[in-house]
């Protein structure tokens, strides 16, 4: 699931 990839990016802001 690529969701975890970009999700960490937005949440890591």
UniProtKB/Swiss-Prot annotation:
Tissues where the protein occurs: Expressed at low levels in roots, stems and flowers. Accumulates in nodules at a high level.
Gene disruption phenotype: Reduced nodule number after inoculation with Sinorhizobium meliloti SM2011; remaining nodules are abnormally spherical and contain a few small rod-shaped bacteroids, their development is impaired. Bacteroids development is arrested at stage II-III and they undergo premature senescence in cells of the fixation zone leading to the formation of vacuole-like structures as a result of symbiosomes fusion. Reduced mycorrhizal colonization by arbuscular mycorrhizal fungi (e.g. Glomus mosseae and G.intraradices).
Matches recorded under Pfam families: ENOD40
Top-level taxon: Eukaryota
InterPro entries assigned to the protein according to its UniProt record, in alphabetical order: ENOD40
Keywords carried by this UniProt record: Nodulation
GO biological process per UniProt: arbuscular mycorrhizal association; nodulation; organ induction; response to nematode; response to symbiotic bacterium; response to symbiotic fungus
Stimuli inducing this protein: Accumulates in response to Sinorhizobium meliloti inoculation leading to nodulation. Induced by the root-knot nematode Meloidogyne incognita at the nematode feeding sites (NFS), and accumulates in subsequent root galls.
Known role: Modulates the action of auxin, and may function as plant growth regulator that alters phytohormone responses. During symbiosis with rhizobacteria such as Sinorhizobium meliloti SM2011, in response to Nod factors and under nitrogen limitation, involved in nodule initiation by inducing dedifferentiation and division of root cortical cells (primordium formation), and essential for bacteroid development during nodulation; this processus is repressed by ethylene.
Note, other: Enod40 mRNA triggers RBP1 translocation to cytoplasmic granules from the nucleus during nodule development.
Protein name: Early nodulin-40-1
Lineage: Eukaryota, Viridiplantae, Streptophyta, Embryophyta, Tracheophyta
